[in-house]
UniProtKB/Swiss-Prot annotation:
Disulphide bond pairs: none
Annotated site, Cleavage, chain positions: H401, N402
Bias (Polar residues): 1-10, 48-60, 127-152, 402-428
Annotated region described as RNA-binding, given as residue ranges: 299-401
RNA-binding as UniProt keyword: yes
GO biological process: viral translational frameshifting
Name assigned to this protein: Transposon Ty1-DR3 Gag polyprotein
Organism: Saccharomyces cerevisiae (strain ATCC 204508 / S288c) (Baker's yeast)
Organism phylogeny: Eukaryota, Fungi, Dikarya, Ascomycota, Saccharomycotina
Function: Capsid protein (CA) is the structural component of the virus-like particle (VLP), forming the shell that encapsulates the retrotransposons dimeric RNA genome. The particles are assembled from trimer-clustered units and there are holes in the capsid shells that allow for the diffusion of macromolecules. CA also has nucleocapsid-like chaperone activity, promoting primer tRNA(i)-Met annealing to the multipartite primer-binding site (PBS), dimerization of Ty1 RNA and initiation of reverse transcription.
Length: 440
């Protein structure tokens, strides 16, 4: 009877029922099924009282749980499973929410949905208040970022102790592909610069300007984990995080090195496409420059074969080297080394021809001395030339007169005439000049 009566009252716990039955068995030896009508009435009153208490105070389990609902308690939210970011090493709420974020924003000010948050991302105060960003947030990568020095807009200034500002810092876009990581990290670095964290970014030599603080490292880790999901990270980034999941600085340093390498590759391609050579520089220097560019490109995965390299080199030749375009352009198996052999041959020929030419250039002081000596030596010549010319003219007249008289004279014969042509004619003048027939 008692078991039938208990089955009619499901709200009475099984433990209490067993306890009552056990107590009856311990104190008395009465059959538990043999119960009087008065006892049944007592059970009815007890069950009615229990039903009234359960009606006024409903159990917490009566409300169904929503697995996607963010509980106000941070500990009740399941942490995200993000691969390289181990949840056993996650930071506490006090570590993730320092008080010194007034200068460059706070991880809690970043837009994300509640079910993506782990306990370390919960901001202080009501969890239902999330900042609303203007329409410019989430724009493409090509859109310019706000000016440096801006901070996030604080939508909960009444409950937060952070300094509220009117301007905001646009966060980087979400990484959606490993191939987009080089472009994404540029926007992430710009985001850090706009957040007054440009001093912690590694420079060209791989070292930051100043030492990063613990709060800044927390901010760096939080923002990188939120906007760069682990499934979209490149392999080399995952390798770094597998060693130290908080070493975001090493990732930034490697990214900057890759940016510089990409810039060098672009410069090398432009330089190789715009080569110019006319022999004004040594052929050895020109060959070293070209071969270094080709080697760097090949090492970085940009392969330049001999055919393409020779075409680019020959296109930039000018002057005496220009004819190499037409003598070698049909050789399909020509190498860069063979082309430079021809360039060296022309350059050496040019240098040899220049060295063989006489050098007429003289010092300026020697030219002045020569001009002075020339003026001094020409003056006596000018003075001595006029009387000589006069005497010569007189001797010619006297000679002509003597010749005419000798011809007209009967005592002269042809032998004397022929003899006079071979012997000098003696003239009686004060200069005693000796003239030959070919002089007049």
């Amino acid at each position: 009877m008692e078991s039938q009566q208990l089955s009619n009252y499901p709200h009475i716990s099984h433990g209490s029922a067993c306890a009552s039955v056990t107590s009856k068995e311990v104190h008395t030896n009465q059959d538990p099924l043999d119960v009087s009508a008065s006892k049944i009435q007592e059970y009815d009153k007890a069950s009615t009282k229990a039903n009234s208490q359960q009606t006024t105070t409903p159990a917490s389990s009566a409300v169904p749980e929503n697995p996607h609902h963010a509980s106000p308690q941070p500990a009740s939210v399941p942490p995200p499973q993000n691969g390289p970011y181990p949840q056993q090493c996650m930071m506490t709420q006090n570590q993730a929410n320092p008080s010194g974020w007034s200068f460059y924003g706070h991880p809690s000010m970043i837009p994300y949905t509640p079910y993506q948050m782990s306990p370390m991302y919960f901001p202080p105060g009501p969890q239902s208040q999330f900042p609303q960003y203007p329409s410019s947030v989430g724009t493409p990568l090509s859109t310019p970022s706000p000016e440096s020095g801006n901070t996030f807009t604080d939508s909960s200034s009444a409950d937060s102790d952070m300094t509220s500002t009117k301007k905001y810092v646009r966060p980087p876009p979400m990484l959606t592909s490993p191939n987009d990581f080089p472009n994404w990290v540029k926007t992430y670095i710009k985001f850090l610069q706009n957040s007054n964290l440009g001093g912690i970014i590694p420079t060209v030599n791989g070292k930051p300007v100043r030492q990063i603080t613990d709060d800044e490292l927390t901010f760096l880790y939080n923002t990188f984990q939120i906007f760069a999901p682990s499934q979209f990270l490149p392999t080399w980034v995952k390798d770094i995080l597998s060693v130290d999941y908080t070493d975001i600085m090493k990732i930034l340093s490697k990214s900057i090195e890759k940016m510089q390498s990409d810039t060098q590759e672009a410069n090398d391609i432009v330089t190789l496409a715009n080569l110019q050579y006319n022999g004004s520089t040594p052929a050895d220097a020109f060959e070293t420059k070209v071969t270094n560019i080709i080697d760097r490109l090949n090492n970085n995965g940009i392969h330049i074969n001999n055919k393409v390299a020779c075409q680019l080199i020959m296109r930039g030749l000018s002057g005496e080297y220009k004819f190499l375009r037409y003598t070698r352009h049909r050789h399909l198996n020509m190498t860069v080394a063979e082309l430079f052999l021809d360039i060296h041959a022309i350059y050496e020929e040019q240098q040899g021809s220049r060295n063989s030419k006489p050098n007429y250039r003289r010092n300026r002081s020697d030219e002045k001395n020569d001009s002075r000596s020339y003026t001094n030596t020409t003056k006596p010549k000018v003075i001595a030339r006029n009387p000589q010319k006069t005497n010569n003219s007189k001797s010619k007249t006297a000679r002509a007169h003597n010749v005419s008289t000798s011809i007209n004279s009967p005592s002269t014969d042809n032998d004397s005439i022929s003899k006079s042509t071979t012997e000098p004619i003696q003239l009686n003048n004060k200069h005693d000049l000796h003239l030959r027939p070919e002089t007049y």
